[in-house]
Regions:
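Hydrophobic faces of well-ordered beta-strands that scaffold small-molecule active sites
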Residues: 43-46, 69-71, 99-103, 126, ...
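Active-site beta-loop-alpha junctions enriched in small/polar residues
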Residues: 48, 74-76, 104-106, 131-133, ...
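Glycine-rich, positively charged N-terminal anion/phosphate-binding segment
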Residues: 22-33, 48-124
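Short glycine-enriched, charge-decorated loop/helix-capping segments at active-site entrances
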Residues: 86-88, 141-147
Length: 378
């Protein structure tokens, strides 16, 4: 049963008149389909390395509104080698459906075999990573570097599509740099070889996460295809930013990664907005504390207490920043080594409350900053 938190706050006001036009278009569209897979909403959780693990996917699903959730990016060769660390990335549960696994690699045979392994394990959809900008991925011919190898990349996509019966999608960027904006051409070719959908992040590899998303570039990808859905991605942290993505690109769906870290309620807000033009606010301090504790318990279930404490620090940082927790208490939780120390830190956080905003009301919006270039550490 979805978990809706403790909210008693009023709905946010109706958005602009242009919002109604966007909503009318969305409501007139047929359901979002990845091949034969029908998605319950057009609001998707993007793959985000280190964050979109099973515990977090369970949380956003409980809050509602997610049409599809995708894993962290997964090394195709690691899957075939049965690496325990890699296999943990694809763990799922009954509540985590439908879900996709995003794989990366530059060898068509390895990618094909990894796709077949995933299909045998019951995965609903496979996503090919063509967007990761970090050097450790691109230097092995994977991620965004695939956008520089047209023939090989099309052959890779075809090999994966033809090897499985489940839908195969691609996530890519606009291109390698501003002189190689190859996304529209790739999208056309992907449609021809049977790719079910394309998600497009509106920056180049050279940009990393710097600058602003180029929605005009995303629109060119939308216009390049005839049938398959295009998913807009990048800088969608609020309903208003999502509305703008729909309005300026004509995309069929949107996906969020960093925005969902700051506001796990974002998917439900979009569903409410699409249906009514209004949406309920994000969670309060108390709501977020409940979510933090719940996600930590899911991590304990999956990894055991010691590994959960270590691995959860990365996620806890963003929870606590969004909750406006003092730096000293954030540090206390980050330094916890035992279950007792972790629980004590949470008790202290609950006792002190937020340093800004109020415990039961709206909190200031959190902006998750990232490095300017193609950097894995943020």
């Amino acid at each position: 049963m979805p978990f809706y938190g403790l909210r008693t706050l009023p709905h946010m006001p109706v958005l602009s008149e242009s919002s109604a036009t966007v909503r009318d278009r969305l409501l007139s569209l047929p359901p979002l389909l990845y091949g034969g897979l029908k998605l319950e909403s057009r609001y998707l959780l993007s793959p985000l390395a280190g964050y979109t693990n099973l515990p977090f996917r369970r949380i956003v699903r409980e809050l509602g509104g997610v049409g599809l959730a995708t894993t962290d990016l997964v090394n195709a060769r690691g899957l075939l080698d049965r690496s325990p660390k890699t296999l943990q990335l694809i763990e799922t549960c009954l509540a985590d459906r439908p879900f996709a696994v995003q794989i990366f690699g530059g060898d068509p045979v390895i990618m094909r075999d990894a796709a077949q392994l995933l299909e045998a394990r019951g995965v609903d959809s496979i996503d090919i990573n063509m967007g990761c900008p970090v050097s450790r991925i691109t230097k092995v011919g994977a991620g965004a570097s695939l956008m520089c190898q047209a023939d090989r990349t099309i052959d890779l996509a075809r090999a994966v599509v033809e090897s499985v019966k489940i839908p195969v999608t691609v996530k890519m960027r606009l291109g390698w740099d501003s002189t190689q904006l190859t996304a529209p051409a790739f999208a056309r070719e992907f449609e021809q070889v049977g790719v079910a959908a394309v998600a497009i992040h509106g920056r180049t590899r050279e940009q990393g996460f710097s600058g602003v998303v180029d929605r005009t570039g995303i629109r060119k990808v939308v216009e390049a295809v005839e049938r398959i859905p295009i998913i807009g991605n990048g800088d969608i942290r609020t309903v208003e930013e999502g509305e703008r993505m729909f309005a300026e690109t004509g995309c069929h769906a949107i996906s969020m990664g960093r925005g969902a870290l700051a506001n796990p309620w974002l998917f439900r807000q979009f569903v409410e907005w699409e249906a009514t033009g209004e949406y309920s606010p994000a969670g309060t301090f108390d709501d977020r504390l409940v979510l933090l504790k719940r996600q930590f318990e899911y991590a304990v279930e999956q990894r055991g207490i010691e590994r959960a404490i270590t691995s959860f620090r990365k996620m806890a940082h963003w929870y606590l920043k969004a909750m406006c927790v003092s730096a000293s208490l954030r540090n206390q939780l980050q330094e916890a080594r035992t279950r007792l120390e972790f629980d004590t830190a949470l008790d202290d956080i609950a006792s002190q409350g937020p340093t800004r905003g109020s415990r039961s009301g709206l909190l200031p919006s959190l902006h998750i900053s990232v490095p300017a270039g193609p950097n894995a550490n943020w």
